[in-house]
Amino acid sequence: MPPALHSIPSRRELIREVHVYAKSSTARGLALFALDIGLYITAIAGVLFLPALWMKIGAAIFAGMVLGRMFSLAHNAAHENIVNGRRLNRFLATVLFTPFFYNYRLWVYEHHTLHHPFPNDVKPDAYKPFSKDEFDALPSWRRALERFYRSPNVLGWGVYYLLQRHWSTKIYPPAYLPKELRPAAWRNTALLGIYCALFLGLLAAAPLYAANLSAMEAILLGFVLPLFVFEVHDGFALYVQHTDPRIAWFKGDVDRNAEGRTELLSVHLVVPRPMGWFYHDTFAHPVHHLHPKIPCYHVYRAQTHLDRRLGSAAVVSKFGIAWLLDTTRRCKLYDWDRHRWLRFDGTPTTEPIAAVRQGDCRRLEHGAALRTST
């Protein structure tokens, strides 16, 4: 184990400490479920029945924001932590996933089996960075798309998640899904198809009952715009959770009790408390990787405890324009051999990450390394 890791508590010790927060409340979980579903129904009702177009557009955007909120709660329910009982958690997760077309069975396999215990490695995953050689080997259109994805713009997050993750891994079973899981996954795909047909039918019939709304307008404002706003939310959340100049990615075997500890490979993005509350504290991410049975309504306090125990080894960033511009400017490509981030032209933007885990395990100061070269 590198000397730097001796200066912080062991993973086992930290899990034991934060386990006190892993307490589910069925009443609280059901209340949050009812609130999220109620907010979504209210937003869609606003699209259908508010009189002015600008009001309908506002309701559509809010519906997409609520879908982002629902994703966080569904994520927790899929970890079986928002209420007591496995079956009820699974039911709530399936219901919450359906309006934004997530296949519950695919999510459980990909997220629980592939991502959660093994983040930041070479398998396909959200925002896995290209090496310089990989990037240079891409066709010109794909290089341009990667530049678009990793620029600080909301459209990039939405387009990335829609094309690279949602459509290809969250709706129908991909080729890598184990054979024994495929029947259940296809049944869930059928559920999504039935829901989609019914919902689109409801929107297409809007001229019969809605206020000042054609069928096309209803589909655009009730279906297309909310889903794209959701894609933006999901793309942004998944980008910031594992992308940071202090965060390493690994090829080959890595010791998940040492330099590959999951709580050291994810970011705690400190957001204003109203934003944290609205999104069920999805940005308190490291402690979720450490102990996924902690429900969203306790995760902020658990994350605060973890940050205090990790000290300067914790990866903590404050939400803001300066943080976003710095991160997106520096985290373009990754040198998988020397563990440092690069610009698209191959210029390093950080020192090798292993070098900052010296002595007391202090992390690279955000924005400090090689600033003159960027």
State each model region's role.
Residues 78, 183-185, 268-272:
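Active-site-adjacent structural elements in folded domains
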Residues 49-74, 91-105, 223-231, 267-281:
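Membrane-embedded alpha-helical segments that form the functional core of polytopic membrane enzymes
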Residues 277-284, 300, 325-326:
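A structural signal for short secondary-structure junctions
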Residues 73-91, 119-131:
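Aspartate-rich (DDxxD/NDxxD/DxxxD) Mg2+/diphosphate-binding motifs
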Residues 1-64, 97-224, 297-374:
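Non-catalytic, topology-defining segments of multipass membrane proteins
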Residues 90-96, 250-264:
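Membrane-cytosol interface motif
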Residues 70-79, 107-120, 237-246, 278-294:
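Histidine-centered catalytic micro-motifs
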Residues 65-74, 103-107, 154-167, 223-252, ...:
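Transmembrane alpha-helical segments that form the membrane-embedded catalytic/substrate-channel core
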